[in-house]
């Protein structure tokens, strides 16, 4: 794996872990009501998507279990549809998709060490 890919994976991991720390002990309703919180999570998801977009095709082909297209697609929807963001989808992504992504990215990084 190239160094650039490893850097991007660390960006994904850092942003994912930060999302988890931000939403820990929060309910979906608290998330929706806290503008600073949901704007922060949206921004971190954008970072994850941008980093995912920069991962080489070689790595994407090697790790097909990671939904690279969905990750990048989420980033695109968040960036270009700012006023139409569905916070229920953001919450679902943060609570259901990010935890397994963290484990997969950790495993990828570990396999490079």
Question: Residues of each region from the PLM?
Answer:
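Solvent-exposed interaction patches of small proteins and small membrane subunits
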Residues: 1-113
